[in-house]
């Protein structure tokens, strides 16, 4: 299940890598444990 760069991701998987190399899921951490606003980005 590919996620394009800029697309939403769950913060747990490296799905962003399968559309282009060195992709990763970047999130904002709220209160140190809640992940929000996760997006696939270029590593």
From Swiss-Prot:
Gene Ontology terms: cellular component: extracellular region; host cell presynaptic membrane
Tissue: Expressed by the venom gland.
Pfam families reported in the protein's UniProt record: Toxin_34
Disulfides per UniProt: 2-19, 9-25, 27-38
Presence of keyword Membrane: no
Residues forming coiled coils: none
Compartmental location: Secreted
UniProt entry tagged with the keyword Acetylation: no
Keywords assigned by UniProt, alphabetized: Calcium channel impairing toxin, Disulfide bond, Ion channel impairing toxin, Knottin, Neurotoxin, Presynaptic neurotoxin, Secreted, Toxin, Voltage-gated calcium channel impairing toxin
UniProt-recorded Gene Ontology molecular function terms: calcium channel regulator activity; toxin activity
Family statement drawn from the similarity comment of this UniProt entry: Belongs to the neurotoxin 04 (omega-agtx) family. 03 (type II/III omega-agtx) subfamily.
Record's function text: Omega-agatoxins are antagonists of voltage-gated calcium channels (Cav).
Domain comment, as recorded: The presence of a 'disulfide through disulfide knot' structurally defines this protein as a knottin.
Protein name, entry field: Omega-agatoxin-Aa3c
Origin species: Agelenopsis aperta (North American funnel-web spider)
Lineage, uppermost ranks: Eukaryota, Metazoa, Ecdysozoa, Arthropoda, Chelicerata
């Amino acid at each position: 299940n590919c996620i394009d760069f800029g697309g939403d991701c769950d913060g747990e998987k490296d799905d962003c890598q399968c559309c282009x190399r060195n992709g990763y899921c970047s999130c904002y951490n709220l209160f140190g444990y809640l992940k929000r606003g996760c997006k696939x980005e270029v590593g």
